[in-house]
Amino acid sequence: MKAGSFYKLGLLVASAVLVAACSKTPGSADGGAAVGDGDATAQGLGQMTHFAGQEPGESYTTQAPHNQLYLFAYDDSTLASKYLPSVNAQAEYLKTHPGARVMIAGHTDERGSREYNVALGERRADTVAEILRMAGVSRQQIRVVSYGKERPANYGHDEASHAQNRRVEFIYEATR
């Protein structure tokens, strides 16, 4: 009976991964991630009514901070200093919006084992989360996940593609 449950769970997870892998990001013709300094709004913010933990009708801004994507060097979990002002802007946003929640997702390129890459992605996300905590953001506002190499931003197999996949993403979580 347990084997059947694990089999069903495996099928469910495989289906979810397949659906996620086949979907395209809106506005991206090649499925690649766009890296830029423009204003970025949190996903789904236009359709939501409030952040988790925030009362409906309580005011909030729909403009998330700049640079919700941070790239890393190969096999490294050290955040480049050029990203610190942007991470600090994220921290200020979270401190002034205590109802806001953010998921920090760590990613790697395709090189290396699954286990190693999940651990590396987690170290990358933890690095950014620790900067937020040191800046005064509540632990309850931060959730860290690692996808390792399972959710590439770019499906290419060259160094430029690998560089886009070695990243941490901020994903603001909202409730309806």
From Swiss-Prot:
One biological process term from GO is:
cell division
Alphabetical GO CC annotations of the entry are: cell outer membrane
Keywords annotated in UniProt: Cell cycle, Cell division, Cell outer membrane, Lipoprotein, Membrane, Palmitate, Signal
Chief location category = membrane
Q: Residues bearing covalent lipid (S-diacylglycerol cysteine)?
A: C22
| Membrane-protein topology | Lipid-anchor
Q: What does this protein do?
A: Part of the Tol-Pal system, which plays a role in outer membrane invagination during cell division and is important for maintaining outer membrane integrity. Very strongly associated with the peptidoglycan.
The Swiss-Prot or TrEMBL record describes its family as follows: Belongs to the Pal lipoprotein family.
Q: How does it assemble?
A: The Tol-Pal system is composed of five core proteins: the inner membrane proteins TolA, TolQ and TolR, the periplasmic protein TolB and the outer membrane protein Pal. They form a network linking the inner and outer membranes and the peptidoglycan layer.
Q: What is this protein called?
A: Peptidoglycan-associated lipoprotein
Gene source species: Legionella pneumophila
